[in-house]
């Protein structure tokens, strides 16, 4: 028998449902659509579609959606990344039926009124871009994805107004991605039977049939590349390593190792991240400082240390612990045989900031 904290997975009428029932009064409901930037037919269209979520639908205004949720003590949001557009609601457990209906209503009945694009959606998207551009680590990561994958995962996540997107483009893209086969429903603090019941009775069942875009996703990988971006402010040096799905366990352990005191230079790292996709993974680590010479010295130390063999087997338990907090993973991750890691010369490198003082890849 599964304990209350364990995951329950099931498939209902094409879409998948994953739940983790926990004690307490709070619940989180997520609808994850394989509609992130890697699937975009125009740069930034996934970001704009995400920003269209919780606008006016055919049955409720955007204001009514917000006010009803506030009265119930809940909140909703829509976010975008490279793999997903994610609709999320946080609420008291007893309000599960309302939020299942609210999220299904957004996917099925968003009205895409023409005036909302220039008046609400694009200004919000420009704000998102301005916030992201103020973060040099985000910019470095963006460069790494672009040189590592070019298209697909290398597409820009956020709308930058370079390529024009019309309301008809958004309608067409939404009809392609908002299908039964292309969504995953996750519940935390939610009973599986209850969630399945309310989902079955909701407009999720009225979504059209389509295809699971993730099943055909295949990334072309490029290694040994670098990119540089001059900007005012803090400087960042970042390393990116594309990872085959068979090596997810090893790099999950490496992420845990680099993020912990097990790695002697962990204090020099500003961010370590291992992101898993259905077909590939990507590990990045970054050094950031207001003084570019400090960044240069520290990234050389970190890369130099990693070019020596590191025993990462002692980080597997930490990696399993972190993995256990995730609601879902695109593949089964196994840690059998995780032992040593040694950085080879296939890594990619990005420098952002005062790049005249930052090293080139072949100087690491």
From Swiss-Prot:
How does it sit in the bilayer? Peripheral membrane protein
Q: Does the keyword Membrane apply?
A: yes
Which InterPro entries does the UniProt record give?
A: Metalloenz_LuxS/M16, MPP/UQCRC_Complex, Pept_M16_N, Peptidase_M16_C
Q: Which compartments does it reside in?
A: Mitochondrion inner membrane
Q: A single Gene Ontology molecular function, please?
A: metal ion binding
Report the SUPFAM superfamilies cross-referenced here. Answer: LuxS/MPP-like metallohydrolase
What keywords are assigned to this protein? Electron transport, Membrane, Mitochondrion, Mitochondrion inner membrane, Respiratory chain, Transit peptide, Transport
Its main localization is mitochondrion
Q: Which GO terms describe its cellular component?
A: mitochondrial crista; respiratory chain complex III
Presequence positions on this chain: 1-15
Query: Which superkingdom is the protein from?
Result: Eukaryota
Please give the Pfam families that the UniProt record associates with this protein.
Answer: Peptidase_M16, Peptidase_M16_C
Membrane-crossing ranges are none
Set out the biological process GO terms recorded for this chain's protein. Answer: mitochondrial electron transport, ubiquinol to cytochrome c
Entries under PANTHER family matching the protein: CYTOCHROME B-C1 COMPLEX SUBUNIT 2, MITOCHONDRIAL, METALLOPROTEASE
Which family does this protein fall into?
Belongs to the peptidase M16 family. UQCRC2/QCR2 subfamily.
Summary of subunit composition and partner proteins: Component of the ubiquinol-cytochrome c oxidoreductase (cytochrome b-c1 complex, complex III, CIII), a multisubunit enzyme composed of 3 respiratory subunits cytochrome b, cytochrome c1 and Rieske protein, 2 core protein subunits, and additional low-molecular weight protein subunits. The complex exists as an obligatory dimer and forms supercomplexes (SCs) in the inner mitochondrial membrane with cytochrome c oxidase (complex IV, CIV).
Q: What does this protein do?
A: Component of the ubiquinol-cytochrome c oxidoreductase, a multisubunit transmembrane complex that is part of the mitochondrial electron transport chain which drives oxidative phosphorylation.
What is the name attached to this protein's record? Cytochrome b-c1 complex subunit 2, mitochondrial
Q: What is the lineage of its organism?
A: Eukaryota, Fungi, Dikarya, Ascomycota, Saccharomycotina
């Amino acid at each position: 028998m599964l304990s209350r904290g364990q995951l329950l997975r099931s498939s209902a009428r094409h879409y998948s449902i994953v739940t983790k029932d926990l004690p307490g009064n709070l619940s989180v409901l997520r609808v994850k659509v394989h509609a992130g930037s890697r699937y975009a037919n125009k740069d930034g269209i996934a970001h704009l579609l995400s920003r269209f979520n919780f606008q006016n639908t055919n049955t409720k205004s955007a204001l009514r959606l917000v006010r009803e949720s506030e009265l119930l003590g809940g909140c909703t949001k829509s976010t975008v990344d490279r793999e997903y557009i994610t609709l999320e609601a946080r609420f008291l457990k007893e309000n599960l039926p309302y939020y299942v209906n609210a999220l299904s209503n957004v996917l099925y009945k968003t009205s895409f009124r023409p005036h909302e694009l220039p008046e609400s959606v694009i200004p919000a998207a420009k704000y998102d871009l301005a916030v992201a551009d103020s973060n040099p680590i985000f910019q470095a990561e963006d460069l790494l994805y672009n040189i590592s994958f070019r298209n697909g995962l290398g597409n820009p996540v956020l709308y930058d107004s370079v390529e024009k997107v019309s309301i008809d483009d958004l309608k067409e893209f939404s009809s392609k991605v908002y299908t039964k086969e292309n969504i995953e429903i996750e519940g935390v603090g939610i009973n599986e039977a209850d969630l399945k019941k309310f989902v079955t009775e909701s407009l999720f069942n009225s979504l059209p049939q389509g295809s699971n875009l993730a099943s055909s996703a295949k990334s072309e990988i490029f290694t040994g590349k670098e990119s540089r971006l001059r900007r005012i402010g803090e400087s960042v040096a970042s390393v990116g390593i594309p990872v085959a799905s068979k090596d997810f366990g090893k790099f999950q352990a490496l992420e845990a190792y680099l993020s912990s005191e097990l790695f002697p230079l962990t204090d020099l790292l500003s961010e370590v991240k291992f992101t898993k996709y259905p077909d590939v993974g990507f590990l990045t680590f970054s050094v950031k400082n207001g003084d570019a010479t400090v960044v240069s010295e520290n990234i050389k130390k970190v890369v130099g240390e990693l070019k020596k063999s590191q025993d990462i087997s002692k980080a597997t338990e930490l990696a399993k612990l972190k993995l256990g907090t995730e609601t879902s993973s695109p593949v089964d991750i196994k840690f059998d045989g995780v032992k040593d890691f040694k950085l080879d010369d296939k890594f990619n490198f990005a420098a952002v900031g005062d790049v005249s003082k930052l090293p080139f890849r072949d100087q690491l």
